[in-house]
Amino acid sequence: MGSLSIWHWLVVIVVVLLLFGRGKISDLMGDVAQGIKSFKKGLQDDDKTAEKTEPVKSIDHAAPPASAPRSDVGSKAV
């Protein structure tokens, strides 16, 4: 009861062909193929864009920035 035999699948295929017809199914498959092609093209375009970007410059955190020493002794709160 849980598994479908070959006869069940044949009946399903015949019903689908009768409902949709040969032309609609081929049009649907063509639309699916175009969608897949445009998706792959978009992925390739993204890869090309990523390759063209310049690498990010790294910042050396080992050396502290050169700045004047801070003195809070002479400051007054207003």
Swiss-Prot record:
Q: Does the keyword Membrane apply?
A: yes
Where is the protein localized?
A: Cell inner membrane
Residue ranges annotated as transmembrane are 1-21
Organism this protein belongs to: Rhodopseudomonas palustris (strain BisA53)
- Family the UniProt entry places it in: Belongs to the TatA/E family.
Q: Where is the composition biased (Basic and acidic residues)?
A: 43-60
What the entry lists under InterPro entries is as follows: TatA/B/E, TatA/E
Source organism, top-level taxon: Bacteria
Q: How does it assemble?
A: The Tat system comprises two distinct complexes: a TatABC complex, containing multiple copies of TatA, TatB and TatC subunits, and a separate TatA complex, containing only TatA subunits. Substrates initially bind to the TatABC complex, which probably triggers association of the separate TatA complex to form the active translocon.
Renumbered to this chain, region (Disordered) spans 43-78
- GO cellular component terms attached to this protein's record: TAT protein transport complex
Q: Name one Pfam family in it.
A: TatA_B_E
Keyword entries, A-Z: Cell inner membrane, Cell membrane, Membrane, Protein transport, Translocation, Transmembrane, Transmembrane helix, Transport
Report the protein name in the record: Sec-independent protein translocase protein TatA
What lineage is this protein's organism placed in? Bacteria, Pseudomonadati, Pseudomonadota, Alphaproteobacteria, Hyphomicrobiales
One Gene Ontology term of the molecular function aspect: protein transmembrane transporter activity
Report whether tRNA-binding shows up as a keyword of the record.
Answer: no
What function does this protein fulfil?
A: Part of the twin-arginine translocation (Tat) system that transports large folded proteins containing a characteristic twin-arginine motif in their signal peptide across membranes. TatA could form the protein-conducting channel of the Tat system.
Bilayer topology annotation: Single-pass membrane protein
Q: Name one GO biological process term.
A: protein transport by the Tat complex
